[in-house]
Amino acid sequence: PRQSGWCLYWNHSVTGDGVIDCYVDDLGKMVLHRAYQPDFAAGLGHYPGRGILTSAEGGGYWIEDIDEPVRNNAYVLRVGSLAVNHRIVTDRDEINLSKMAEHTRVTIRLDTGE
């Protein structure tokens, strides 16, 4: 069974629209499970064979069941400006990466206890 999850929220640097990538801890493996995209502009989109495309309530699209493992359980991100507003959101917390590390390369790593 899957364990805890978190989502990376941000505003697309070209369109300014909100984008979401949601990850889960799948028995010690970081896995991209689903993604929200407001439209398919500026590099966003769905690729056949990579998840299931569904319409989101209120507009936009969810790509469900992507289930793509993240290499080495580590996601490398260059944190965007305050306008991009990168943030990690869980059921209980929100961490604003743009406020903490604007324009900095960070690694988001799954802690497996090893």
Model-predicted segments: where are they?
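N-terminal secretory signal peptides
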Residues: P1-P38
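Mature, soluble, non-transmembrane domains
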Residues: M30-H33, L44-E114
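Mature extracytoplasmic/periplasmic domains
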Residues: F40-A42
